[in-house]
Swiss-Prot record:
Membrane topology: Peripheral membrane protein
Species of origin: Nitrosococcus oceani (strain ATCC 19707 / BCRC 17464 / JCM 30415 / NCIMB 11848 / C-107)
Keywords in alphabetical order: Cell cycle, Cell division, Cell inner membrane, Cell membrane, Cell shape, Cell wall biogenesis/degradation, Glycosyltransferase, Membrane, Peptidoglycan synthesis, Transferase
Record-given protein name: UDP-N-acetylglucosamine--N-acetylmuramyl-(pentapeptide) pyrophosphoryl-undecaprenol N-acetylglucosamine transferase
Membership in a protein family: Belongs to the glycosyltransferase 28 family. MurG subfamily.
Length: 359
């Protein structure tokens, strides 16, 4: 009988794509993978598409919500816990793996109550609420950034799981030195899109002389695609605009520089691909974790920080023109990013699951 692992991850791509990377590795080894998620997160689309059965629970985030949400919270948590317990009893997993996000809370607590081995992985440079609460209950604690958890948790630095196709991209210098013509600018708003980037980037590019404008590939989010089209048209700037990019490896291979938020997934992929970036952290992220993610790259010389409060078309245009004037800067940033990457994170996390399951 195959080993069965239940993975808990939901909400945004920052939790789901690393979990899918681990799930794919486990499945390649003959392990049966079951998912726990919500119907309103990105997992509702991505997980069934990847071929994994999914158990639904009804839960949402609480931090940053109003009083009404907090008053209803105990009842919602009890409902989610009962749903998680039902799923755990049904599937009887050998191991439960939580990758953060609100879905991990009830599932992780349920695993502990049923004495199922629990492992957790934190993708951000600051521990999220669910993982902070589950860490004392977990048999193994893993982190994407070194030193995220306090020493008492004895967390293992595994790195952040990314898609294998991104890790397999050619070495940064060879890739970038082969480039000819104007440089390539990739703009990423995350799985939700980032309105401020959709509005500011075309205005910034319009300020640049035509001869120094980069080619642009802009992922703007499905809900904001029409607005981005209008913004680029109004600015008189040509760009390839897409709601979502399925093949991120191809996008990173194409790019010389990325303008993006600093979510865990994006930062991990920048390091794995070996590419420099202008990072604009989302200022309302819980515990300002995107700023902490960004700082890890900035300190190493792999990225430049551009806080949203300082973001303007003129400032962004200035930075893009400055970086584009010296191609060696792209290469040095890319190499610095690649050196930060911890290779094989998906395999490492998958191996820990099997070690616990067999041990």
């Amino acid at each position: 009988m195959a080993i069965r692992v239940l993975i808990m991850a939901g909400g945004t791509g920052g939790h789901i794509f690393p979990a899918l990377a681990v799930a794919d590795r486990l499945r390649a080894w003959g392990v049966e993978v079951v998912w726990m998620g919500t119907r309103h997160g990105l997992e509702a689309e991505l997980v069934p598409k990847a071929g994994y059965p999914i158990e639904w629970i009804s839960i949402g985030g609480l931090r940053g919500k109003g009083l009404t949400h907090w008053l209803r919270a105990p009842f919602k948590l009890l409902l989610a816990l009962s749903q998680a317990l039902r799923a755990l009893r049904r599937w009887q997993p050998a191991v439960v793996l939580g990758l953060g996000g609100f879905v991990s809370g009830p599932g992780g607590l349920g695993a502990w109550l049923l004495r199922r081995p629990l492992l957790i992985h934190e993708q951000n440079a600051i521990v999220g609420t669910a993982n902070r609460l589950l860490a004392p209950l977990a048999g193994r604690v893993m982190e994407a950034f070194p030193g995220t958890f306090p020493p008492a948790r004895k967390a293992e630095w595994t790195g952040n799981p990314v898609r294998e196709s991104i890790e397999q991209l050619s070495e940064s210098r060879a890739r970038l030195q082969a480039r000819q013509g104007c440089f390539h600018l990739l703009v990423l708003g995350g799985s939700q899109g980032a309105r401020i980037l959709n509005e500011t980037v075309p205005q910034a590019l319009a300020l640049l002389p035509t001869k120094v404008r980069p080619q642009v590939w802009h992922q703007c989010g499905s809900r904001q695609w029409e607005g981005a089209v209008v913004a680029y048209r109004a600015a008189g700037v040509e760009a390839r605009l897409v709601p979502f990019i399925d093949d991120m490896a191809a996008a990173y291979a194409w790019a010389d520089l990325v303008v993006c938020r600093a979510g865990a997934l994006t930062v991990a992929e920048l390091m794995a691909a070996g590419i420099g970036a202008l990072l604009v952290p989302f200022p309302l992220a819980i515990d300002d974790h995107q700023r902490a993610n960004a700082d890890y790259l900035v300190v190493a010389g792999a990225a430049l920080l551009l806080p949203e409060k300082e973001l303007s078309p003129s400032r962004l245009a200035q930075e893009i023109e400055r970086l584009g004037a010296d191609y060696s800067t792209f290469i040095s940033m890319a190499q610095a990013a690649r050196q930060l990457h911890r290779v094989g994170a998906a395999q490492r996390v998958a191996e820990r699951c099997l070690e616990v399951a067999s041990g």
